[in-house]
Design a protein with these regions (language model features):
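N-terminal membrane-anchoring alpha-helices
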Residues: 1-45
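A structural signal for short, hydrophobic/glycine-enriched beta-strand patches
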Residues: 29-186
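A transmembrane-helix-recognition feature enriched in membrane-embedded lipid enzymes
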Residues: 26, 177-202
């Protein structure tokens, strides 16, 4: 028979663990909401556009919103480099980065200013590759993506030695769709702590 004191201790530990996990999640959610409202753009070495879906060689509305915002930053002459990211999805014939590059060029960004990162299959891989593309003394970047993405992007960018500023697009269709916005925000509130603790376990 298991002693009652052992059972009681087990329940207390389980309750404490659940409370700690809930506290971490709540703090993460608050930080996701805070970060999505921040726009810390300033002069940098590169503007980095995080990839999103492309449809048969055309940028999806989400990807287009990100590129359009990055072009606004480019036109403000905040950075000399314009980096587009994103690999090839299952069944795709081209990469998100290639589509983003063509679209940016069609809007006036010169090809000579654009760098493409087309190997990454995740946010983490893309940012790691971007860090490798930039010389050690040129790590200041402005990260462009959807608002809910900003906290985790900052965490991951720092892991790879980048010095990130964030500037979220305000025109993404995800932000205008309550159910989609809720879904992605909740997902980021779980992903951000994983990225944070993984960073500091290195």
């Amino acid at each position: 028979m298991i002693p009652r004191t052992s059972t009681s201790l087990g329940w207390r530990l389980a309750r404490a663990a659940l409370l700690a996990a809930a506290s971490v999640w709540l703090l993460s959610l608050i930080l996701v909401l805070v970060w999505e409202r921040m726009d810390s753009r300033r002069d940098a070495h590169a503007i980095v556009v995080l990839g999103a879906a492309q449809w048969d060689g055309r940028p999806s509305p989400v990807l287009r919103a990100r590129i359009d915002h990055a072009i606004e930053l480019w036109e403000q002459q905040l950075a000399p480099r314009f980096i587009v990211t994103g690999g090839r999805g299952p069944g795709d014939t081209t990469t998100e980065a290639a589509v983003a590059k063509r679209y940016a060029m069609s809007k006036g960004v010169p090809e000579s200013a654009i760098l493409t990162e087309s190997e990454g299959r995740s946010t983490s891989e893309s940012l790691r590759n971007v860090a490798q593309m930039l010389r050690s003394e040129q790590k200041d970047v402005i990260l462009v993506s959807d608002p809910f993405h900003m906290l985790r992007l900052s965490i991951l960018a720092r892991r790879f030695g980048l010095k990130p500023r964030t500037s979220p697009t305000r025109t993404s269709p995800i932000s205008k769709n309550r159910s989609e916005y809720f879904k992605y925000t909740m997902a980021e509130s779980w992903k951000a702590p994983v990225a944070f603790f993984f960073e500091f376990s290195k």
